[in-house]
Amino acid sequence: MKLDSIDSFVVGNPNPGIGGRYFIFIKLTTQCGISGYGEIYNASFGPHLVAAMAEEVFAQEMAGEDPFQIEKIWRRVYSRGFSQRPDITLMGVLSGLEIACWDIIGKATGQPVYNLLGGKLHHRLRSYSYLYPPEDAEAETFYADPDASAEIAARYIEEGFTAVKFDPAGAYTILDPHMPALEDI
């Protein structure tokens, strides 16, 4: 089995971009037609540039390789630069590519990926929701209003969630896209 192609998908998130401004997904396909999907995290650059980075890494380091050889691929990609210490964006790209390889391996062997990674640890997982403002609310005022937050938290409990996650400083995605200054927080 050999890796044959990569497709990338940049999915935007409507303003104010709560939960992230965009997501970058990739699809790797083998010569025998098995596809695996991965997500690239922690992109320091624009999403289309990061997707192009994934396509370049695939073309230079992974095309024609056996997806079962994750350690070999990982070490080669990790050691690409002269410093052999990649930046955080390349690590996000590598993570997405590795996830897609694990997906391919799981499909090829008929196993859930968790079995390949050591087995199931929990039979149930607690689900929580981030504390998002309602669609008709202004995000900046929502995060400053504890009563509005409590109302949404109660609604999530009614939906079956047993916990909510929130940032006491509010979501950074409601601010300008520059690095927030202390006064912004």
Name each model feature, range by range.
Residues 1-6, 107, 111-125:
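N-terminal amphipathic alpha-helix/helix-capping segment at the start of soluble metabolic enzymes
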Residues 1-44:
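Structured beta-strand/loop patches that form or line metal/cofactor-binding pockets in enzymes
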Residues 14-18, 89, 158:
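Short Gly/Pro-enriched turn/cap motifs at secondary-structure boundaries
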Residues 19-21, 92, 120:
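Short coil/turn motifs at beta-sheet boundaries
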Residues 23-25, 96, 126, 163:
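Broad gene-expression machinery/nucleic-acid interaction feature
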Residues 29-109:
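Metal- or metallocofactor-binding catalytic centers and their adjacent structured scaffolds
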Residues 100, 112-113, 149-152:
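Short alpha-helical segments and helix-capping/turn motifs at coil-helix boundaries
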Residues 124, 129-185:
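Metal-dependent enolase-superfamily TIM-barrel catalytic cores that perform enediolate-based chemistry
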